Amino acid sequence: MAHIALVAILALLTICIAIRAQDTVNATTLTGKYMCGYQGWFECPGDGSGGGWFHWFNSQNPVHSSLNVDLFPDFAEYAANELFATNMHYSDGSVVKVNSSYPLTTEMRHFKWMKDYNIDGVWVQRFGPKHVGWNDFTNKVLLNCKTAAETYGRVFVVMYDVSGANNSTLFNDMTSDWMYLVDTFKVTSSPRYLKHKGKPLVSVWGFGFPDRSITTDVAQQIINWFKTGAPAKYQATIMGGVNDDWRTIGPPWDSVCRSVDIISPWFVGRFGDIAGADSWKTNNLIPDVAECKSLGKEYLPVIWPGFS
């Protein structure tokens, strides 16, 4: 069935390589997991969030010329009250409706699909503020994922994306947010929050990218805090989402990228055909794995469902 592939579009999933899931996923290790990135950033007027259109369209006019996704999902399995009308129409004249990430029913449906089709869990992504009300929205999505993971025996992990972040406040913003999630939302107390190497797992995505504002000193400060600098209940095993040239980037990013516990290079869009994939395997994947082995680091490759 195509719908799990379509979850990739509903949440812009990037699927991390691993193996078959079980009815209740082992939440003590990342090893052997088939995990997806869950961005949860689709908003619709009337979804309960109090916001307008976000990410489905690049304006508040929900027409095809403003559509902001590459592939359009099949919503056949959604209930009528989960969908929100646009100003677009299908060829038969019926109104095109889309889903929001805000209602709990959305995450419950996605996590049920993940259980049905043997996906172990998700990286629930957290971005800096996108608009007024964004923090409340993204908190609701995270709590929805927590509830859905607990219901369907999946796992979830917080993934911070530094895209667009303010470098001067990023360390305080991220560490304060993590402490809030641990203390107020009790995310790491959930039996479905994924642990690895005896600690909760956290990912920070965006190290070593030339178009991200984060500097090496702030990146290293964040890594050190999660690994050993924070009070014990906030410490975590940290996975770094790094640029594809992490191994050859040179100083000062080379030492930063090598200081995380798990290295996960960004593959998305790096090749577009079989020949390109073969070249990537030879020139990146194999030497990346060898480098990680020599460093005593773990390695998590990424695949994606296919879009421009």
What are these regions (language model features)?
Residues 3-19:
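Cleavable N-terminal signal peptides of Sec/SRP-targeted secreted and luminal proteins
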Residues 21-308:
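Glycan-processing catalytic domains of CAZymes
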